[in-house]
């Protein structure tokens, strides 16, 4: 697992894939910049298709609403040999962490 603060540090690395496991509606309302939306409830169905395109040497960072779904998905992916991190506390902890002085500099996209 990683903290909300560490998410930005990992984002700067070359081979990082950030995956939002929330619903498409939640994703459209607010998501981490550059994150791919892969809803947790559809994860089993499309997991293999997505994983075909993600190199095992890359790092996947998963987040959800509060951190529980991303932790479960991370465990499954690690069993398959992928490098995976889960954001503790999910998007709510990240967006409420006051990591930036100005909303312009935030990696969170809010479409309201």
Spans of model-derived segments:
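Rhodanese-like catalytic fold shared by cysteine-dependent sulfurtransferases
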Residues: 1-10, 16, 24-59, 65-112
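Active-site flanking residues adjacent to catalytic metal/cofactor-binding acidic residues
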Residues: 19
């Amino acid at each position: 697992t990683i903290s909300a603060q560490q998410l930005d540090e990992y984002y700067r690395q070359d081979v990082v894939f950030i995956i939002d496991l929330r619903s498409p509606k939640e994703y459209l309302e607010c998501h981490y910049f550059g994150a791919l939306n892969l809803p947790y409830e559809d994860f089993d169905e499309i997991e293999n298709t997505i994983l075909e395109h993600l190199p095992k040497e890359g790092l996947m960072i998963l987040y959800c609403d509060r951190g529980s779904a991303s932790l479960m998905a991370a465990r499954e992916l690690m069993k398959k040999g992928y490098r995976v991190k889960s954001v503790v506390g999910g998007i709510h902890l990240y967006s409420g962490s006051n990591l930036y002085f100005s909303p312009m500099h935030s990696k969170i996209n809010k479409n309201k």
